Design a protein with these regions (language model features):
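Amphipathic alpha-helical and helix-coil boundary elements used as assembly
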Residues: 1-678
Length: 678
């Protein structure tokens, strides 16, 4: 005769089908932040049950009147058959358990963890009445959150662990509800249960028969550090510690990167981590036979010899075990005996923590790490060829992202690595929409991608023909928008044909603040299609060791503010087609060492050592006539030169900031605000 505490009336209810299953035995484990699994051994008079037809059906395991566990049949096995009964095994799991079989790779942007988890649950056909959030505070928005090569279940568990969220299940015959919480208020409370030291006597009511408490060493302080490129000199460090540190050496949990971009978030994450350590410092373990114990519920314990243990305990883990041998009416090659004497009824084992310790889930589901690099395609708004922000960051679409639409919303802004980067100096080339780029991940974190280079492929070919011109190096751009034009710097290293080639599609501006020196070893050729303007603010010196050959297709205008001096070693020969007009404000002196001849119209005047010879048909001296008139000089002035484009020098770090950065000391947050001159 069994006492009421040990009487068993286990039953399995599957409302969708008719069956004659009797429960022979069941075991199961419930844990906070874990899907439960209940394994049942059943017997039936039918030996022809279709196993596949029962998969995914909801079922209710009744353990006590009105109490039990609800789940879906996720595995069904037919076993041995006797003369009349056949044995079956099945597993009950929550809807959440199905998420273990769905793996995804995708990106969530500008959503809170609550919104992300809700989205995943809805996608898995878990209706909104089957889960709820019981939060004491709003969860902040995550600008960028990647699910990378992890199951939906792993993803949800990881997010809960990162945010310090817990979840448990509430059961009824109609279904089970998944409950998320961030503090102790979301845990329901069971009726109190008495403690009865195991003595071999059978209790009249369910009791806790064994109860032990273990205290373990845990860190008493947490420190986190991170880096934010938008405030590079601000030391992002935060921490949390016990208000009254125990009399022991300081046990610090320090980690980098801490996963935050501002100190407020850092303090929050540090506090969650400290609570995680402390929630597992004291851990109670017990055994009993009360069938309504559930993980995620408070258990009020009474009757223990240690009065301070008679308190609320949070059940974090419950192991269920039930046997009902009376379901067997004949032997099916089974032995219902047990070494520990448990052959019939219900019993459990449980793990609990003090109610005062805020329970945080252990970090058992790490964020996936991406080893190495990946390729992606730069994206942007429709019709835009270059899409970037003030930091030169661009957006990409990864090849594994099935949900992105190749627009400006595909990813977060990705920083672009450069061979050199300073304060307004260095090198920069913005990857353009459609380019394939190489993406790496800081610390292997899928949420921190950055671009390290660009890649050619069969449609985007190099700007030089390869391998025919494998000795060439080139930096070639494309005019935007519309293309067609380009700028290029090309270097040819083929022996005997070395060349540096520069092409400017429109303007080429040079600004040299001091000297320019140019040496051409052979010939220099220069072609200007329009006007050529040159302005020298000081002297112009030019030496030609050979001939100077100059041809003017039109006029030559020369305006000299001072004197012009011309020295010719041998002859000055000028052939003028129409007129030479020399005019002077005061005098003109023409001097020749041996001979001076003026010749016109068959007449001439000749001056030489022998005298002055005047020859002409008629020679008139003071006999009328008039002088000829010249055209007169009217030289045009040159046009003004246009200034070259101008840039500005970069800046060094402020000495105080540089010193603090090197020493790892905190900086003034105000000085780090964008636009600060400090």
């Amino acid at each position: 005769m069994f006492s009421p505490a040990n009487e068993a009336h286990f039953a399995l209810h599957i409302d969708a089908v008719e069956h004659d299953f009797s429960v022979l035995e069941f075991t199961g484990v419930e844990r906070l932040n874990q899907p439960y699994a209940i394994e049942l051994t059943l017997v039936s008079e039918r030996a022809d049950i279709d196993s596949a037809s029962l998969l995914h059906l909801p079922a209710w395991l009744e353990i006590s009147p009105g109490g039990g566990l609800h789940g879906f049949i996720t595995r069904f096995t037919q076993g041995e058959s006797g003369r009349r009964l056949t044995r079956y095994q099945l597993r009950l799991s929550p809807q959440l358990g199905y998420l273990e079989y769905r793996t995804n790779q995708r990106i969530f942007q500008h959503q809170s963890v609550e919104q992300i988890i809700s989205c995943v649950l809805r996608e898995n056909a878990i209706h909104s009445d089957a889960w709820r959030f019981s939060l004491s505070a709003d969860l902040g928005e995550r600008r960028y959150c990647t699910q990378y090569d992890e199951t939906d279940l792993h993803f949800i568990q990881r997010l809960c662990e990162e945010e310090g969220l817990h979840f448990h299940f509430e059961h009824s015959r109609q279904g089970h509800v998944l409950v998320f919480g961030d503090d102790q208020t979301s845990f329901p409370q069971l009726e109190s249960i008495g403690f009865s030291q195991g003595s071999g006597m059978v209790a009249d009511q369910p009791v806790v028969k064994r109860f032990s408490l273990t205290a373990a060493t845990r860190p008493d302080r947490v420190s986190r550090r991170d880096y934010n490129f938008e405030t590079p000199h601000l030391l992002l460090e935060a921490g949390a510690r016990l208000e009254s540190a125990p009399a022991q050496p300081a046990l610090e949990d320090y980690d980098y990167p801490g996963g935050f971009s501002d100190r407020g978030r850092g303090r929050q994450l540090s506090q969650i981590q400290l609570e995680r350590h402390r929630s597992h410092q004291l851990e109670a373990r017990g055994e009993g036979d009360r069938p309504d114990l559930r993980s995620g519920h408070f258990l009020p314990l009474t009757g223990h010899l240690r009065d301070d243990w008679n308190d609320l305990w949070l059940l974090t883990e419950v192991h269920h075990h039930g046997k009902q041998p009376q379901a067997l009416e004949e032997s099916i090659s089974s032995d219902t005996s047990a070494v520990d004497g448990f052959v019939q009824g219900y019993r459990n084992r449980f793990v609990a923590t003090p109610w005062q310790a805020i329970w945080r889930p252990p970090l058992e589901h790490p964020k996936p790490r991406i080893a190495g690099s990946q390729s992606a395609v730069v994206t942007g708004p429709a019709g835009e060829e270059i899409h970037c922000d003030q930091h030169g960051r661009v957006k990409v679409q990864f090849h594994w992202d099935r949900e992105a639409q190749a627009d400006e919303h595909t990813s977060c802004w990705l920083r672009v690595a450069s061979g050199w980067a300073g304060d307004r100096y260095g090198a920069i080339a913005i990857p353009r929409v459609g380019m394939e780029v190489l993406v790496s991940f800081l610390e292997g974190d899928p949420d921190q991608p950055l671009i390290t280079g660009c890649l050619y492929h069969v449609e985007h070919v190099p700007p030089i023909e390869l391998p025919a011109h494998k000795t060439r190096s080139s930096f070639k751009t494309l005019s935007s928008p519309g293309g067609e034009g380009y700028n290029e710097l090309r270097i040819e290293d083929r022996k005997g044909a070395e060349q540096v080639y520069i092409h400017a599609q429109r303007d080429w501006d040079q600004r040299i603040e001091h000297d320019q020196r140019l040496h051409v070893g052979n010939e220099r050729h220069e072609h200007t299609a329009a006007n050529h303007y040159s302005e020298h603010l000081a002297e112009l010196h030019r030496t030609v060791h050979g001939d100077r050959l100059t041809e003017l297709k039109s006029s030559d205008h020369l305006s000299i503010a001072g004197n012009q001096h011309c020295r010719i070693g041998q002859s000055l020969l000028a052939d003028v087609g129409r007129e030479i007009h020399l005019a002077s404000g005061r005098k003109i002196v023409i001097e020749a060492g041996m001979e001076l001849t003026i010749k016109a119209g068959g007449s001439f005047i000749k001056l030489d050592p022998s005298g002055v010879t005047i020859s002409g048909p008629t020679v008139r001296i003071n006999s009328g006539g008039k002088p000829g008139q010249g055209t007169g000089a009217s030289p045009r002035l040159p046009g003004d030169t246009a200034p070259a484009d101008r840039s500005q020098a970069g800046s060094l770090l402020v000495p105080a900031q540089r010193q603090a950065l090197m020493l790892g000391k905190p900086l003034c947050a105000i000085c780090e605000e964008p636009g600060s001159d400090a």
